[in-house]
From Swiss-Prot:
It comes from the Eukaryota. Endothelins are endothelium-derived vasoconstrictor peptides. Probable ligand for G-protein coupled receptors EDNRA and EDNRB which activates PTK2B, BCAR1, BCAR3 and, GTPases RAP1 and RHOA cascade in glomerular mesangial cells. Also binds the DEAR/FBXW7-AS1 receptor. Promotes mesenteric arterial wall remodeling via activation of ROCK signaling and subsequent colocalization of NFATC3 with F-actin filaments. NFATC3 then translocates to the nucleus where it subsequently promotes the transcription of the smooth muscle hypertrophy and differentiation marker ACTA2. GO terms for biological process: endothelin receptor signaling pathway; intracellular calcium ion homeostasis; positive regulation of protein localization to nucleus; regulation of systemic arterial blood pressure by endothelin; regulation of vasoconstriction; vein smooth muscle contraction. Keywords: Cleavage on pair of basic residues, Secreted, Vasoactive, Vasoconstrictor. One of its GO terms (molecular function) is endothelin A receptor binding. InterPro entries: Endothelin (IPR020475), Endothelin_toxin_CS (IPR019764), Endothln-like_toxin (IPR001928). Its main location: secreted. This is Endothelin-1. PROSITE patterns: ENDOTHELIN. It is found in: Secreted. One of its GO terms (cellular component) is extracellular space. Belongs to the endothelin/sarafotoxin family. Residues 30-44 are annotated as: Endothelin-like.
Length: 76
């Protein structure tokens, strides 16, 4: 229990209770309350696409630095 300001103490929120448990849920930026909410849906999907792009770029940068070519016996 932790105090929050001048009000009554409240229980501490555990981070593991807030995180999704399924692997597919972790891929999404967020979850919309309504599937008909187009703005929310676009925002959540945009985060997923940006993370995929970042991962692809990181992999390519490592490849250019020669980190992924060690099995070939050459530097890229």
């Amino acid at each position: 229990v932790v105090p929050y300001g001048l009000g009554s103490p409240r229980s501490k929120r555990a981070l593991e209770n807030l995180l999704p448990t399924k692997a597919t849920d972790r891929e999404n930026r967020c979850q919309c309350a309504s599937q008909k909410d187009k703005k929310c849906w676009n925002f959540c999907q945009a985060g997923k696409e940006l993370r995929a792009k970042d991962l692809m770029e990181k992999g390519w940068n490592n490849h250019k630095k020669g980190k992924d070519c060690s099995k070939l016996g050459k530097k890229c």
